[in-house]
Design a protein with these regions (language model features):
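Rossmann-fold cofactor-recognition segment
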Residues: 31-50, 55, 71-72
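Hydrophobic positions on the long internal alpha-helix
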Residues: 51, 93-101, 165-166, 227, ...
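Short, flexible catalytic-loop segment of classical short-chain dehydrogenase/reductase
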Residues: 186-197
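Canonical Rossmann dinucleotide-binding motif of NAD(H)/NADP(H)-dependent dehydrogenases/reductases
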Residues: 1-29
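C-terminal helical subdomain
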Residues: 92, 154-155, 160, 184, ...
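Catalytic loop of short-chain dehydrogenase/reductase
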Residues: 72-76, 102-177, 189-190
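A hydrophobic alpha-helix adjacent to the NAD(P)-binding/active-site core of NAD(P)-dependent oxidoreductases
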Residues: 37, 82-83
Length: 286
């Protein structure tokens, strides 16, 4: 059996993943702001450093996988906390845990993204670029023009940025070359305590209920956990740098023609250059 770290372990989708893993006999190290094996506030640099170090101590330097499920929704006035938890609370922990993941040679990582990555309009590219550059303050300045709509934009930007980080890093020697499979899962509206709170808030409930979901209703946290278990399994060895949507069809409804998309002619030279430069990381593995 393996050892797995799961953030957001105390409730919602993270807790459902913890239950599934423990049912299979795995050792799970849960991380959350309360009621967890490791209690940490991922909205602060100190909290993230502490969580990173505590997990490494608890796993004795070896992790078979990690699930980054901790996240905050579009809470009014919480742009900074959303940014810190949803982006830096993923990236900084994974950077800290990478040696432990590499030690097992076949580790799997699942990052919880969101279908907000493709269904929230007008997310400023400069905010995404700022996050990828590690500049939270610059990203926050980009949200000011949105006023009361700042939190949804901050939420979407944090999820887009973390997906970009996953896709850029998943195919590098440090990750793929170390045998680590790094992927992201993009849920839609899943019935969790966070969604229940939104549905109980009159100012938010109408928008949540009216948001287009072609198959109707809301997703089930247990079913999402089953997706995660698959992505952590040996069956997902060939899954690398992927973003998987599990959202009842919302992404397809809004953007049926946006992707897949062929490489445009203007990028052909760069495409051919990358093709010539490619070297498989398999040869560097034992």
């Amino acid at each position: 059996m393996g050892t797995f770290a799961v953030t957001g372990s105390a409730s919602g989708m993270g807790n459902a993943v913890v239950q599934r893993l423990r049912e299979q006999g795995h050792h799970v190290i849960g991380i959350d702001i309360k009621a967890a094996d490791i209690v940490a506030d991922l909205s602060t640099p100190a909290g993230r450093r502490g969580a990173g170090a505590d997990v490494l101590a608890a796993c004795a330097g070896r992790l078979d996988g990690a699930v980054l499920a901790a996240g905050l929704g579009p809470i009014p006035g919480a742009e900074r906390v959303i940014t810190e938890v949803n982006y830096f609370g993923v990236v900084e922990l994974l950077q800290a845990w990478r040696p432990a993941l590499a030690a097992t040679d076949r580790a799997k990582v699942v990052v919880f993204a969101s279908n907000s990555t493709t269904t929230v309009p007008a997310v400023p590219g400069r905010a995404i670029r700022a996050l990828l550059a590690g500049d939270a303050d610059k990203a926050l300045r980009a949200y000011r023009m949105f006023g009361r709509y700042g939190p949804p934009v901050a939420y979407a930007a944090s999820k887009i940025a973390v997906c970009r980080w996953v896709r850029h890093n998943a195919v590098t020697e440090q990750w793929a070359g170390a045998g680590i499979r790094l992927n992201a899962l993009a849920p839609g509206a899943i019935m969790t305590p966070m969604l229940e709170e939104q549905l109980a808030t009159p100012s938010e409930a109408k928008a949540v209920r009216e948001f287009p979901v072609p198959i109707g209703g809301f997703g089930d946290a247990g079913q999402l956990a089953d997706w995660v278990i698959f992505m952590l399994s040996d069956s997902a060895d060939f899954l690398c740098g992927s973003l998987v949507f599990v959202d009842g069809g919302s992404d397809a409804y809004f953007r049926p023609d946006d992707w897949p998309r062929a490489v445009p002619a203007r990028r052909l030279a760069a495409y051919l250059r990358r093709t010539r430069q490619f070297r498989s990381f398999e040869r560097s593995r034992p």
